[in-house]
From Swiss-Prot:
This is Zinc finger protein zfs1. The gene is zfs1. A zinc finger (C3H1-type) spans 326-354, 364-392. One of its GO terms (biological process) is negative regulation of conjugation with cellular fusion. Its main location: cytoplasm. GO terms for cellular component: cytosol; nucleus. Binds to specific AU-rich elements (ARE) in the 3'-untranslated region of target mRNAs and promotes their degradation. Binds to ARE present in the arz1 mRNA and stimulates the rate of arz1 mRNA decay. Required for coordination of septum formation with exit from mitosis. Involved in the mating response pathway. Induces sexual development and ascus formation. It comes from the Eukaryota. Residues 150-168, 304-317 have a biased composition (Low complexity).
Length: 404
């Protein structure tokens, strides 16, 4: 499986052990080994080379497991002169350990600044010889056929390098040398990273950098300062509430007539008479036309108010003469109990049988028997029930129906 450089775990150089630890070159281990071999004690040494070799073959950080890629059949140890830690980047190792390790096979492909500047490389500058860098960028292996060693990099020909010979999809010859102080820079980069010409008289397209406002950053000055009252008058005259101003919805504009011409010309007349301060008064000619109610409408309104003096009665209970339809149709309870009423002649109820009137009834009033009274002998409506409760009254109503 091939990993991209961005998906690999990249450990910072400050936290790596560089160069990687090698027990064979460790002076402490060598001193202990020499002491154990030269000691008088005939017993087994504390740390034997065979034990260290077996430990290195099994669990050392320099050990390369064989299960990383299927094409790698046998495990192999890294060479002692290899300065790349396999714990940070476990990638393909060459099957033949006698071959010199190349950067491409070592699986560290993304540090490609230049051959003369080794900053950022994972290997020492001694490995960056001419043939190594050409092999790194051109893709031609110095060992001949590398088909048995698949590389994690698909192609290195597009990587920029001054030492590459055939990589020319990227050309950096036109850029100015920013590290050379002897050359005067003819091009400069603006804030967006775009090269622009540097001139003392000309300014860049960023006026806020120099602190000098330009015309593009400011709005156009207003010719006339309108007051709030002037704006309200213009809106009220130029845009009537009953006429829609937008014609996009299919509304046909009103045909200009003699009455509409005064309204259309009102804003222009107002603008001529008003000063910028907006303190000039309105004249009679410039006042908007407001339709006044006609005399016939006033007469109708007055007549309607006279016909409804109280305004509390509904259309169902109000007679044409303005009085209730049920006026004096029920006896006054206060008059029946005490014989007096505080309302007097203004009372809406009848004070005696002389004033009692028959209320307007439905034509079928008391013409049928009450079902609840016939079945149960009781009716919740009582005397107000519109149906018959007495048999005598029922017989009378039946005879009245048969007589015509």
């Amino acid at each position: 499986m091939v990993y991209s450089p961005m998906s690999r775990p990249q450990v910072p150089l400050a936290f790596r052990q560089w160069p990687p630890y090698n027990y064979k070159s460790d002076p402490l281990v060598n001193s202990k080994l020499s002491q154990s071999t030269t000691s008088v004690n005939a017993g087994p040494s504390l740390i034997s080379p065979s034990f260290l070799d077996s430990y290195a073959n099994s669990s050392s950080l320099l050990h390369k497991p064989s299960t990383n890629l299927g094409s790698l059949k046998t495990s192999s140890l890294l060479a002692s002169d290899e300065v790349f830690p396999s714990s940070v980047m476990p990638q393909l190792r060459p099957l033949d350990s006698s071959l010199s390790v190349s950067p491409e096979m070592d699986g560290w492909p993304w540090h490609h600044n230049s051959s003369s500047n080794p900053q950022g490389y994972a290997w020492t500058p001694s490995l960056l010889s001419s043939n190594a860098t050409s092999y790194l960028h051109s893709g031609s292996s110095p060992h001949g056929n590398t088909s048995n060693h698949p590389s994690p990099i698909s192609s290195l020909e597009s990587l920029p390098s001054r030492s590459s010979t055939g990589s020319g999809s990227l050309d950096f010859s036109g850029l100015a040398n920013l590290h050379d102080d002897s050359k005067s820079l003819a091009m400069s980069l603006n804030m967006a990273g775009v090269p622009v010409s540097v001139d003392e008289n000309s300014q860049t397209s960023f006026p806020f950098v120099h602190g000098q406002p330009e015309s593009t950053m400011s709005r156009k000055p207003k010719l006339c300062v309108q007051s709030k009252s002037m704006t309200n008058i213009r809106n009220s005259v130029a845009k009537p509430s009953l006429v829609r101003q937008s014609h996009s919805a299919g509304v046909i504009p009103i045909k200009p007539t003699a009455s509409n011409a005064s309204i259309r010309n009102a804003p222009s007349n107002l603008s001529k008479q008003f000063s910028p301060s907006g303190n000039s008064p309105l004249t009679e000619a410039s006042k908007p036309f407001v339709p006044q109610p006609s005399a016939a409408g006033d007469f109708r309104q007055a007549k309607g108010s006279a016909s409804h003096p109280h305004g509390s009665g509904s259309s169902n209970g109000v007679a044409p003469n303005g009085k209730r339809a049920l006026y004096k149709t029920e006896p006054c309870k206060n008059w029946q109990i005490s014989g007096t009423c505080r309302y007097g002649s203004k009372c809406q109820f009848a004070h005696g049988n002389q004033e009692l009137k028959e209320p307007p009834r439905h034509p079928k009033y008391k013409s049928e028997r009450c079902r609840s009274f016939m079945m149960y002998g009781y009716c919740p409506y009582g005397l107000r029930c519109c149906f018959l409760h007495d048999e005598s009254n029922a017989q009378k109503s039946a005879t009245i129906k048969q007589s015509p």
